[in-house]
Amino acid sequence: MPTGDYDSKPSWADQVEEEGIDVEPLSPQIKKQDPASFVLDTPREVINGNIKTITEYKLNDKDKKIKIVRTFKIETLKASKVVAHRKNWKKFGNSEYDPPGPNVATTTVSDDVLMTFITNKEDLNNQEEEDPMNKLKGQKIVSCRICKGDHWTTRCPYKDTLGPMQKELAEQLGLSTADKEKAPGAEPEPAQAPVSKTGKYVPPSLRDGGSRRGESMQPNRRADDNATIRVTNLSEDTRETDLQELFRPFGSISRIYLAKDKTTGQSKGFAFISFHRREDAARAIAGVSGFGYDHLILNVEWAKPSTN
């Protein structure tokens, strides 16, 4: 039986098994070449807009011809002159005949590293000038006449509740707080002694208050307890200034204590207000108890005297 060297063509079943990859037998000349140079045809490039498609044919491990299609997106980036000049260098070694651009077989492309140079010298000429508007951020430019907040009076959230109540109380009392302090029944302020401007030594007996008798703090504390009221059902956003504006129309206030949470700083819902006169405290209980304030109904009553 005669024999001869001939190339066997793959069957149709083998082509389907290779999932549609073009398969061609190897010629004897190709088999003698180095496997690293098994590039059958010159890669074909097709550029469509900013999409570049490269098609080439190579041999796999089974000595079969395969088709490789690579798609690239072209992006134009601005680079410095030094970088552009470095890209035009002539390649050498295994990449001597490579096209422009990196080759994954010989080149590893990593992320760009941005370098920041820090100098010890401070450039005083490039310091940013201070914005005069930043200085006014911490200052209170606008003050509300009703709640003393940092907004206009026409935009006060308590305009419909606190404003009418203050006007009604002022009409019932018939006097403003400033007029009440000037009334005949009010205690006159003690006259201040003239201050010596000569720089000479003044004995304690001749100084301001030296001729008066010392007063004990215990009677004043008892008087405060008798004219102290307790306000409950306050909102968490209540401040001392809100209580001052709410109870000031009834009389002179000596002390305000608002219970606050140590961690959050918000109100615990109750406070103590001490008046100079018990009559003012009684009017405050009658006027504010049951009053709606900040969507809550306030409860005002006499505070229990302390046992200390």
UniProtKB/Swiss-Prot annotation:
First-listed, main subcellular location of the protein, grouped into a coarse class: cytoplasm
Residue segments, region Disordered: 1-35, 176-227
Entry-linked Pfam families: eIF3g (PF12353), RRM_1 (PF00076)
Signal peptide coordinates: none
Any one GO molecular function term: RNA binding
UniProt feature, compositional bias: Low complexity: 185-194
Alphabetized SUPFAM superfamilies for the sequence: RNA-binding domain, RBD
Compositionally biased region (Basic and acidic residues): 209-227
Biological process, per Gene Ontology: formation of cytoplasmic translation initiation complex; translational initiation
Keyword vocabulary terms for this entry: Cytoplasm, Initiation factor, Protein biosynthesis, RNA-binding
Subcellular locations according to the entry: Cytoplasm
RRM domain ranges (all copies): 227-305
GO cellular component: eukaryotic 43S preinitiation complex; eukaryotic 48S preinitiation complex; eukaryotic translation initiation factor 3 complex
HAMAP family xrefs: eIF3g
Reported function: RNA-binding component of the eukaryotic translation initiation factor 3 (eIF-3) complex, which is involved in protein synthesis of a specialized repertoire of mRNAs and, together with other initiation factors, stimulates binding of mRNA and methionyl-tRNAi to the 40S ribosome. The eIF-3 complex specifically targets and initiates translation of a subset of mRNAs involved in cell proliferation. This subunit can bind 18S rRNA.
Family note: Belongs to the eIF-3 subunit G family.
Subunit details: Component of the eukaryotic translation initiation factor 3 (eIF-3) complex, which is composed of 13 subunits: eif3a, eif3b, eif3c, eif3d, eif3e, eif3f, eif3g, eif3h, eif3i, eif3j, eif3k, eif3l and eif3m.
Name the UniProt record assigns to this protein: Eukaryotic translation initiation factor 3 subunit G-B
Lineage per the UniProt record: Eukaryota, Metazoa, Chordata, Craniata, Vertebrata
UniProt gene name: eif3g-b
